Amino acid sequence: MASLTSIATPYPSSSQALRLKSSGNTLFSAGVRSAAMVSGHKTLKIQCTSTKPAKPAAEVDWRQKRELLLEKRVRSVDVKEAQRLQKENNFVILDVRPEAEYKAGHPPGAINVEMYRLIREWTAWDIARRLGFAFFGIFSGTEENPEFIQSVEAKLDKEAKIIVACSSAGTMKPTQNLPEGQQSRSLIAAYLLVLNGYKNVFHLEGGIYTWGKEGLPVETIEED
């Protein structure tokens, strides 16, 4: 399956602006942020809103993310260990998959905060990204959830004991083919959590897929 995270487009910086002057008529333009009146002229200042947003966590080099995870002693646990920690040590499983996947089946008691969500905005940059996904036949393109940390903070304090989970989970363990492991949504989420002050972060090795494969209990949420 083709995967696309972003498309670089030559949009001007948000600091650039066009100044249009008219001696007698008022100019109207979509996207006008502010207008300044100049003696004898009416001046419109149009500020570009199509600038690419700040670099998302997914685009930070995996080596850099992995180093921080190891430095903060983020440890991977298998599904049976995760279940034990959840039952005996008040660990919370944080499922970072899309909401629809979470509702279709998740570990009992797990909470959901999406690491990625459907693209919601309609700026020029977001339209370009939608077109890029559509080029590959993908009509439900996703973006990193800019409210991920705020949403987690609303549910879990910085002292909470968290096991981050996604579908297949990736790994920090080196292999012959992947000497630095392989990143995943849950490892990117774990990186953001420790970067923002969470102190007890674990990672579910094998992900929700392995949880179900091992025959561990799963809850579903039916749509109304």
From Swiss-Prot:
<dbReference type="GO" id="GO:0009507">
    <property type="term" value="C:chloroplast"/>
</dbReference>
<keyword id="KW-0809">Transit peptide</keyword>
<feature type="active site" description="Cysteine persulfide intermediate">
    <location>
        <position position="166"/>
    </location>
</feature>
<feature type="transit peptide" description="Chloroplast">
    <location>
        <begin position="1"/>
        <end position="48"/>
    </location>
</feature>
<dbReference type="GO" id="GO:0005856">
    <property type="term" value="C:cytoskeleton"/>
</dbReference>
<feature type="domain" description="Rhodanese">
    <location>
        <begin position="87"/>
        <end position="220"/>
    </location>
</feature>
<keyword id="KW-0934">Plastid</keyword>
<keyword id="KW-0150">Chloroplast</keyword>
<dbReference type="InterPro" id="IPR043186">
    <property type="entry name" value="Str14"/>
</dbReference>
<dbReference type="GO" id="GO:0009535">
    <property type="term" value="C:chloroplast thylakoid membrane"/>
</dbReference>
<dbReference type="Pfam" id="PF00581">
    <property type="entry name" value="Rhodanese"/>
</dbReference>
<protein>
    <recommendedName>
        <fullName>Rhodanese-like domain-containing protein 14, chloroplastic</fullName>
    </recommendedName>
</protein>
<dbReference type="InterPro" id="IPR036873">
    <property type="entry name" value="Rhodanese-like_dom_sf"/>
</dbReference>
<dbReference type="InterPro" id="IPR001763">
    <property type="entry name" value="Rhodanese-like_dom"/>
</dbReference>
<dbReference type="GO" id="GO:0009941">
    <property type="term" value="C:chloroplast envelope"/>
</dbReference>
<dbReference type="GO" id="GO:0009534">
    <property type="term" value="C:chloroplast thylakoid"/>
</dbReference>
